[in-house]
Design a protein with these regions (language model features):
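Conserved short beta-strand elements that form part of the metal-binding/catalytic scaffold
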Residues: 29-64, 108-115
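Mid-chain, well-packed structural core segment of small domains
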Residues: 62-84, 91
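Short secondary-structure junctions
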Residues: 28-34, 85-90
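Vicinal oxygen chelate
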Residues: 1-2, 81-119
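Conserved active-site tyrosine of GNAT-family acetyltransferases
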Residues: 19-26, 80, 106
């Protein structure tokens, strides 16, 4: 598996509106909309994405992640499974196909594959 880059970084906050305004108005990031994504997304000029979401639930089901870009999501998942790493099912939205997994420290990450024509 080859990690080509970081597709996005996600952050939880209770100051959702203030964070959005700061990212847009002060840092100059561009708001973007992606169908099927509940977080507010902001793009840097090189296309990197910062996601801002409400605080996660106590059970961690809304835990934010770092998305690692791969060219072949199915192949990358197979490599993780071969290494004994569990993943959840493949999900997708208008921009990415993705699957979550936990690093050795227990933190949630995901592998993301850009949808055709969206990279």
């Amino acid at each position: 598996m080859e990690i080509r880059g970081i597709g996005f970084v996600g952050s939880h906050t209770t100051a959702h509106a203030a964070m959005g305004a700061f990212l847009r108005d002060v840092l100059g990031l561009t708001p973007i909309a992606v169908a099927g994504v509940g977080a507010a997304l902001f793009a840097a000029s090189n296309g990197d994405v910062l996601a801002v979401a409400p605080p996660y639930e106590e059970d961690g089901s809304k835990e934010r992640t770092i998305g690692l870009i791969v060219d072949d999501l199915d192949g990358a998942i197979a490599e993780l499974h071969a290494a004994g790493v569990e993943t959840d099912g493949i999900s997708e939205n208008a921009r990415w196909r993705y699957s979550h997994f936990r690093m050795p420290d227990g933190k949630l990450y995901e592998l993301v594959e850009e949808q055709a024509g969206r990279g």
